């Protein structure tokens, strides 16, 4: 009897239709008592994320969601907060939503949010 190699199995599977392949997967699941469902892996990944959320956040991102009516004032505040050049600050404001500051303390994030909001921008701290 000729021995079947992995390459032979792969070649055989490549020639199967999607319907036949789906039926084969179901039969294999029943025969070996396993599941090919991906949500199990997703649930395992979500676990640590929940634990991290429970810890107190120490670094915040200031996100410019929209420039509002007074775009020039917002550009000036962005330049002051980030020390970007005029063109870079304008591109950041035009490309909203964009992070203005990342990984800053809560106090610094709140101060930046206050300044941007006073200039007419829509801001979010994450």
Curated annotation (Swiss-Prot):
- Please give one Gene Ontology molecular function term for this protein: structural constituent of ribosome
> In which domain of life is the source organism classified?
Bacteria
Q: Which UniProt keywords apply?
A: Ribonucleoprotein, Ribosomal protein
Q: Write out the ranges of the annotated region (Disordered).
A: 97-126
State the Gene Ontology BP annotations: translation
Whether Ligase counts among this entry's keywords is no
Under the heading SUPFAM superfamilies, the entry gives: ClpS-like (SSF54736), Ribosomal protein L7/12, oligomerisation (N-terminal) domain (SSF48300)
Feature: compositional bias, Basic and acidic residues: 104-116
Q: Which GO terms describe its cellular component?
A: cytosolic large ribosomal subunit
Q: Which InterPro entries match?
A: Ribosomal_bL12, Ribosomal_bL12_C, Ribosomal_bL12_C/ClpS-like, Ribosomal_bL12_oligo, Ribosomal_bL12_oligo_N_sf
UniProt xrefs under HAMAP family: Ribosomal_bL12
What is annotated about its quaternary structure and interactions?
Answer: Homodimer. Part of the ribosomal stalk of the 50S ribosomal subunit. Forms a multimeric L10(L12)X complex, where L10 forms an elongated spine to which 2 to 4 L12 dimers bind in a sequential fashion. Binds GTP-bound translation factors.
Q: Which family does it belong to?
A: Belongs to the bacterial ribosomal protein bL12 family.
Function noted in UniProt: Forms part of the ribosomal stalk which helps the ribosome interact with GTP-bound translation factors. Is thus essential for accurate translation.
Q: What is this protein called?
A: Large ribosomal subunit protein bL12
| Organism field | Geotalea uraniireducens (strain Rf4) (Geobacter uraniireducens)
> What would be the name of the gene that encodes this protein?
rplL
């Amino acid at each position: 009897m000729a021995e079947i190699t992995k390459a032979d199995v792969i070649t055989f599977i490549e020639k199967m239709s999607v319907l036949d392949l789906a039926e084969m997967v179901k039969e294999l699941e029943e025969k070996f008592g396993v599941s090919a469902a991906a949500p199990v892996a997703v649930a395992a990944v979500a676990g640590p994320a929940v634990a991290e959320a429970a810890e107190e956040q120490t670094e915040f991102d200031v996100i410019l969601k929209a420039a509002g009516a007074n775009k020039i004032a917002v550009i000036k505040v962005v330049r002051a907060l980030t020390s970007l050049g005029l063109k870079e600050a304008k591109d950041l404001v035009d490309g909203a939503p964009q992070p203005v500051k990342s990984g800053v303390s809560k106090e610094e994030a709140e101060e930046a949010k206050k300044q941007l909001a006073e200039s007419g921008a829509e801001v979010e701290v994450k």
